[in-house]
Every structure is written in C-alpha cells, then in structure tokens.
Amino acid sequence: IGDHRLSDAELLALLRSTQEPAPAEAGSPAIDKGVECLIQVIDVLVGLQELNSASFRGSSHRAVHLAGAVAERMDLLPTEKLEIVLATLLKDIGNAGVSEALFEDVGTFSSDKHEMMKQHVSASVGLLEHIDFNWKVLPIIRHHHERYDGTGYPDGFKGPEIPVGARILA
C-alpha cells in the first residue's frame, strides 16, 4: 500500500469488476463508456484534491483497495460494490473547502480544528448533491465518519442506522 497509487488501468479494472450491466442494454458500449468516463473524471478530481497534500496523497486509492476487499469479502451485490468504490473516491472531495493549514497539523486536532475538519462531510455532500447519481453514493459519503457506537458524525447514527457502505469506510 504505502505510496502506491492505482494506475488508470487498475482503477478501471476494479470498477468494471463491480459494474452490473443494465438489464435492457447489457453489454452496451455506450453504458460501459459512460461509466468509464465518469470514473476517469472522478479520478482526475481526486488526484487534483490530493496533489498538494503529502498526508492525503494516494489515500483515496488505498481506501478503494481496502473497501473493495471488504465489500468483496462480504459478497455484496455488484451495484453495492460500485457504490462503495465511487463513494470511497468522492468522500473527501469537500476537503477542497477546508483550510490547507488544517491539514499541516500532525497528530490529534484541537476541538476547534476537529469541528472545522468535520465540515468536509457537508461540503462533499453539497458539492455532489445536485448530481443525479444512478447509485446510492451520497448516504455513504454523508455517513462515512459515523461510528458503530453512535459517537461519530454528522448525525450520531449507530449500528444498523449507518449505511453498510459507510460502515465499511468508517
């Protein structure tokens, strides 16, 4: 894992392995190309976001590997796996709106800085909520910092209240 960044081919292969073809147009080149383009755009956005942050560089791709492995082990449906992979890539896109100085801190955040950091969840959802995803990506993104015991954020969900994909990411 370390500094390993998925190549475009590796990322596309992982996402294609989770893709469930549309019943009416199974194998349609247009659908496959559309999903492939979406993945490439997401990969560019994630790469731009992580470009200037040594602490975050490659973290989304490492998280994709781990979340994908857990989803595979849980034998989730292909659509659920795709949702988890997409949410994993997009979950921290709202960090673009958080002060860069905050990311320079090493160790535990003060409570004020922790409150500032929490804003990335609503920022991520805010940036993405106008997109009519064909998958349940936003609930996973919104709840990826919830904790099974209810001590997480933003809503303090616990146990089965937390979407499965968000539980995997948390």
Which residue ranges define each predicted feature?
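Histidine- and acidic-residue-rich, metal-dependent catalytic cores
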Residues: 1-170
